[in-house]
């Protein structure tokens, strides 16, 4: 049972997944006291959130003093931590930026939460990138991960965060759940991915169809069925619902100190298969596809084994890849430009 007056802090709540989640939980329980913390001053998203009764605090994870002040003012019972640098390619070229924001920033948040000296549930947005290159077709949480597996600094930063959170949770009043996201797509309208520089495949594919600009496919010579990367896609709605289900599950399992779960569909789809589905959504529009060399930091296959989530908190997928692409199209055609 989730109390009506529970105080919720969503860190990184102006971003894509954070803002969708803020909207989702207010829809589930309008009595929750929800506050968003972010260093992004996207006024359009802030206005959308305020319309549904969500407050906004400006704070940067790297400003430890300000972050501590904000957390103390909110006094959250539950914290959802979505804030991070997330571009794999940028992390390869600027690893220090990623360790600074994702690792030091998370440490600062843990410190601010710990200062409250009360029981707090912390849900951390991790990533499938922690698994790096693996020979397993369906990746389970039981796989032993080491720092040498990560194929990029982004994945390594998330792995280090998980290690830190596990160590802290053992001797604190925190209950921590790390959620390893696979490839998130779709929208919960009017919220979606307002990041104009996103590196995610589906938003860029949708924009290429709408604007009739080139779409770059990196690699068609992987050891896969059609030569392109295989990934696991999950709708942002199902990501949000999984967090809500897990929150209710954790309320009934107060002895749990630390857990990890994969969040994906459990279905592998190649980049070329994604393009084929998008062609059907956008028919008769054509795609200007350009093949570029594969990138060294991209694993050939990343697909989730989601058996643990299904068995533990009845996780299920409600939307498919066509839904994700259609929702992204609706978002970019009817809502995206409102922010600019």
UniProtKB/Swiss-Prot annotation:
SUPFAM superfamilies for the chain: NAD(P)-binding Rossmann-fold domains (SSF51735)
Keywords: Carbohydrate metabolism, Galactose metabolism, Isomerase, NAD
Reaction(s) catalysed (UniProt annotation): UDP-alpha-D-glucose = UDP-alpha-D-galactose
Biological or metabolic pathway of the protein: Carbohydrate metabolism; galactose metabolism
CDD domains: UDP_G4E_1_SDR_e (cd05247)
EC number(s) on file: 5.1.3.2
Residues annotated to bind NAD(+): 16-17, 37-42, 60-61, 82-86, 127, 154, 158, 182
Similarity section: Belongs to the NAD(P)-dependent epimerase/dehydratase family.
Its biological purpose: Involved in the metabolism of galactose. Catalyzes the conversion of UDP-galactose (UDP-Gal) to UDP-glucose (UDP-Glc) through a mechanism involving the transient reduction of NAD.
Protein name per its UniProtKB record: UDP-glucose 4-epimerase
Source species of the chain: Mycoplasma genitalium (strain ATCC 33530 / DSM 19775 / NCTC 10195 / G37)
